Amino acid sequence: MTKPNHELSPALIVLMSIATGLAVASNYYAQPLLDTIARNFSLSASSAGFIVTAAQLGYAAGLLFLVPLGDMFERRRLIVSMTLLAACGMLITASSQSLAMMILGTALTGLFSVVAQILVPLAATLASPDKRGKVVGTIMSGLLLGILLARTVAGLLANLGGWRTVFWVASVLMALMALALWRGLPQMKSETHLNYPQLLGSVFSMFISDKILRTRALLGCLTFANFSILWTSMAFLLAAPPFNYSDGVIGLFGLAGAAGALGARPAGGFADKGKSHHTTTFGLLLLLLSWLAIWFGHTSVLALIIGILVLDLTVQGVHITNQTVIYRIHPDARNRLTAGYMTSYFIGGAAGSLISASAWQHGGWAGVCLAGATIALVNLLVWWRGFHRQEVAN
């Protein structure tokens, strides 16, 4: 890959963080609106959950098939093109008149919003080695803030003009961001001589050959499944008695998650200092404990907010640590590493959404919390019994 000819200035870091957050947010505007959308289309809770699942499966497909292109093509042009195509997907969602059309729009948006995952390795490439973890932490904080603040913004806009307004406004913002990225990003040409099938094949070969990548991908998969289990069903909890909250109020709970995400930013710095295994162990322990507070959230808003803060803090902390660790493996193949890791990550998110919607329908909030705590426990045991020892030794 060509040597970067453009310094990673603070202004460019901010632009890339906002772009990353805005891109990934497009997959999550629907979550606080699921109850409203379900009533609009006369859907059950589990059927409405397919809207979120479609976005995450589209995102997973984009991670696997589109993100590796960042190691093949000039990245500024690729990033801008994908940003515009994601905006088109949201236009389809905004104008949808059926569940099938809405699923199509959200799937297309998810497919092309993986532009966020081309921006992250680009930032890692532009950053100096001693600051790479901090830069990745900042960009990833932008990503998780986008996921969480999407709910707040969606709720407020839905209160003002209905749920369709959310997607009309978001599509315009994505188009404007494409213009800003065209003006702000440096040109970054790739020197790889692999063709597209070889690029995809190398993603799988890295998975087969690298134990650390497989470890971190599995941890990310299970961690993000936890995240999706909470946020997919929370709108149903808060829209029902005893809360009976509106879309706007439900969206405000995203602010608690945003605070937790910001608190995890130092995780990249700890990874830079060789403490990634400590950060991972501590984060997974807190993730399991967060479900206790979340369970009490069915009667206590304060307990729910505390649980959201802790869960989002740990999810983001483990995620930043994972990415900082894997970017050390093959510096010349960061887009392919991202493709492999993030495909696993969002497969976990899609599975978490399906599990959450089903758990809510059959077991209510207790069922959701049981599912989340079980997966958190499995995640911790997998790390502690096997992978933790292997990575510390490495």
Model-derived features with residue positions:
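Flexible cytoplasmic inter-helical loops of multi-pass small-molecule transporters
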Residues: W182-S205
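Intracellular juxtamembrane helix-capping segments at the cytosolic ends
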Residues: V115-A127, G317-H330
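Helix-to-loop junctions at the C-terminal end of transmembrane segments
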Residues: L63-E74, L262-S276, W360
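Conserved MFS/SLC helix-loop-helix module at the cytosolic interface between two early adjacent transmembrane helices
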Residues: A61-L99
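C-terminal transmembrane helical hairpin of 12-TM major facilitator-type secondary transporters
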Residues: H277-N322
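Helix-loop-helix hairpin linking two adjacent transmembrane segments in secondary transporters
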Residues: M101, T138-L185
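Cytoplasmic helix-loop-helix junction between adjacent transmembrane helices
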Residues: G105-G142
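Structural signature of the two symmetry-related core transmembrane helices
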Residues: R77-L91, H278-L292, A373
